[in-house]
Each structure stands twice: as structure tokens, then as C-alpha cells.
């Protein structure tokens, strides 16, 4: 048996504003040390998985898994190496990184 609760007034809190949702998604991506470190490494330019793994002291497959999450979030994308198309390099999507930064700053101000 379900009892309805009386309505006392308008709720003070509603659904989060879109900028809060965006900031939450960005914060979720950066909440992991490895993902945050990958984004910091990629600030210097395109880098392959093996170079990131060596710099971070992580295994290649772990870095690849984190890159997949960052790619799904739109923060990074893969590019083929000019001299050897077998090699994938990752780079930041600077527009997406700037949008994530702006979303976080809007919420934190």
C-alpha cells in the first residue's frame, strides 16, 4: 500500500543545470590519476600508447583502456603516424578540453 505525501511547496532543488552535468562529466574523466596524467602528457603534442605507458609507469593495455574512455568522452582522438600508418598517435581535442575546463570553471566560481 502506497501513501502519497502531501505537497508542501515548490521544491528548492530541481534537476542540475546543463553546465553542472557537463562539469560532472569532465570531473569524472579527471578523477582518475591516469586519465588526468594522459591529458597532461598530450598537452605537449601527439603521443603513442607505448610512450605514454613508459612515461606513466603503466602497462600499454591500461593506458589504452583509459584512452578509450577519454576518446568516448571526446577529449582525445587518434591520428595515424605520417611516416608509418601502422602507428596510432593520440592527441587532445583542444576544443573539447577547453569546453570541459569552462564547464568546471562555471561551477567552481
Give each language-model segment a name.
Residues 51, 72-83:
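Beta-hairpin "wing" of winged helix-turn-helix
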Residues 1-5:
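Long, compositionally biased intrinsically disordered regions
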Residues 88-109:
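Conserved segment of winged-helix/HTH DNA-binding domains
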Residues 66:
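Residues within the DNA-recognition helix of helix-turn-helix
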Residues 35, 72, 106-108:
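Juxtamembrane/membrane-water interface recognition
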Residues 7-27:
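Short, Lys/Arg-enriched N-terminal segment that forms or immediately precedes the first helix
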Residues 21-62, 83-95:
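N-terminal helix-turn-helix DNA-binding core of bacterial DNA-binding proteins
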Residues 69:
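Alpha-helical DNA-recognition elements
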Amino acid at each position: 500500500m502506497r501513501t502519497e505525501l502531501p505537497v508542501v511547496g515548490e521544491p528548492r532543488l530541481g534537476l542540475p543545470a546543463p553546465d553542472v552535468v557537463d562539469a560532472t562529466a569532465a570531473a569524472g574523466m579527471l578523477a582518475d590519476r591516469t586519465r588526468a596524467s594522459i591529458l597532461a602528457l598530450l598537452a605537449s603534442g601527439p603521443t603513442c600508447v607505448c610512450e605514454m605507458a613508459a612515461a606513466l609507469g603503466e602497462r600499454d593495455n591500461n593506458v589504452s583502456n583509459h584512452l578509450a574512455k577519454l576518446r568516448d568522452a571526446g577529449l582525445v582522438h587518434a591520428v595515424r603516424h605520417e611516416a608509418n600508418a601502422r602507428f596510432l598517435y593520440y592527441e587532445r581535442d583542444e576544443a573539447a578540453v577547453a569546453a570541459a575546463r569552462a564547464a568546471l570553471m562555471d561551477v567552481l566560481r
